[in-house]
Structure formats: structure tokens, C-alpha cells
């Protein structure tokens, strides 16, 4: 399924990863992954979802096109087995390695979405924090603690497809 909407000389098209029409290849200026990669990573072994998404993103981008990523970030000292996406968190090093393996070049990062109060580790899930507050809706004290932390610590990364 693919749609094109024109607004202010901008064409927005969408498709599902793994089913991107070939006529979209090499046409996009940008691809965005906003708090989505943890879901792809957690099912990578069952269906190659992360790899497929990276390959499709690379295919649809024009040379020099960019990929913006906002993702719940696990601290680098956390266990890989925990930071595999199941709890909502991924390590920055994991994302950078996956993007490099797909052919993308790292361009920049921003701390705009960082939250030092979110020190998640084994046993924690991202959905414990606002806005979900999973596990604390009936516990006023725990809910207040989660609200004091605020939303998750998130990495904000920029990559590009090399110019040919």
C-alpha cells in the first residue's frame, strides 16, 4: 500500500518494510525511525525485521539521503541480553553497528532527548515511565517516582546514505 500526498511541494509516501515498491527506490530524501527500532530488534531472529528495515531504508533513499533515529537508549554498561529491545531499550553502539552494516555513515547526534534520570537496568521496562506508567497505575507512590523520572532517556542520531 502506497500513498502520495502533496503539500507545499512535498510528497509523502508510505509502505511496509519488506514490501516497498521498487518505484520508491532512490526517491526519498529522508527516512525516520521514531521509537520503533526496539520492536524490530526484538524480532530480528524470528524474521530479520531490523535487517529488512535497514535494507529498505537504504534502497528508498537517494544518494546522500538521511536517516533520523530517536530511540530509547540503554546505557552501554547494561547487559546486551537486557538491551535487546524486549524492554524497549537499545544501546547506541548496537544502532551504530547495525546502520554501518547496512551501509550508512554516522553524521551526528544530539542530546535533546537525553534524560539522565532514566537509569534503567535489568528488570526495568521503558513502559514503566510516562506516558504509559505500566505497573504503577494503582500504586500512587511508585507512579509519583516514575513521573519524577519523566520520559525515557533517548538517543537522537543522524545517518546518511553515501553519495554515489
Q: Predicted regions span which residues?
A:
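Single conserved hydrophobic/aromatic residue that forms the stacking wall/gate
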Residues: 1-12
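A short acidic, Gly/Pro-enriched loop at the edge of an enzyme's catalytic core
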Residues: 21-32
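Residues lining the SAM
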Residues: 34-37
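Conserved class I S-adenosyl-L-methionine
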Residues: 41, 65-90
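A short glycine-rich, Lys/Arg-flanked "PGG" loop and its adjoining helix->strand segment in the class I
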Residues: 47-63
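Short alpha-helix
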Residues: 88-109
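C-terminal lobe and adjacent flexible extensions of AdoMet/dcAdoMet transferase-like proteins
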Residues: 102, 141-164
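Conserved catalytic loop of SAM-dependent methyltransferase domains
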Residues: 110-132
Amino acid at each position: 500500500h502506497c500513498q502520495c500526498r502533496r503539500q507545499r511541494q512535498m510528497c509523502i509516501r508510505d509502505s511496509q518494510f519488506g514490501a516497498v515498491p521498487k518505484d520508491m527506490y532512490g526517491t526519498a530524501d529522508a527516512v525516520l525511525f521514531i521509537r520503533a527500532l526496539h520492536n524490530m530488534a526484538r524480532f530480528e531472529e524470528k524474521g530479520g525485521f531490523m535487517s529488512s528495515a535497514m535494507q529498505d531504508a537504504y534502497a528508498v533513499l537517494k544518494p546522500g539521503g538521511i536517516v533520523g533515529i530517536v530511540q530509547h537508549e540503554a546505557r552501554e554498561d547494561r547487559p546486551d541480553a537486557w538491551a535487546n529491545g524486549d524492554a524497549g531499550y537499545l544501546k547506541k553502539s548496537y544502532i551504530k553497528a547495525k546502520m554501518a552494516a547496512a551501509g550508512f555513515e554516522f553524521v551526528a547526534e544530539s542530546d535533546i532527548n537525553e534524560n539522565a534520570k532514566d537509569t534503567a537496568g535489568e528488570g526495568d521496562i521503558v513502559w514503566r515511565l510516562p506516558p504509559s506508567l505500566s505497573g504503577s497505575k494503582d500504586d500512587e507512590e511508585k507512579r509519583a517516582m516514575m513521573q519524577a523520572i519523566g520520559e525515557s532517556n533517548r538517543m537522537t542520531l543522524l545517518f546518511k546514505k553515501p553519495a554515489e
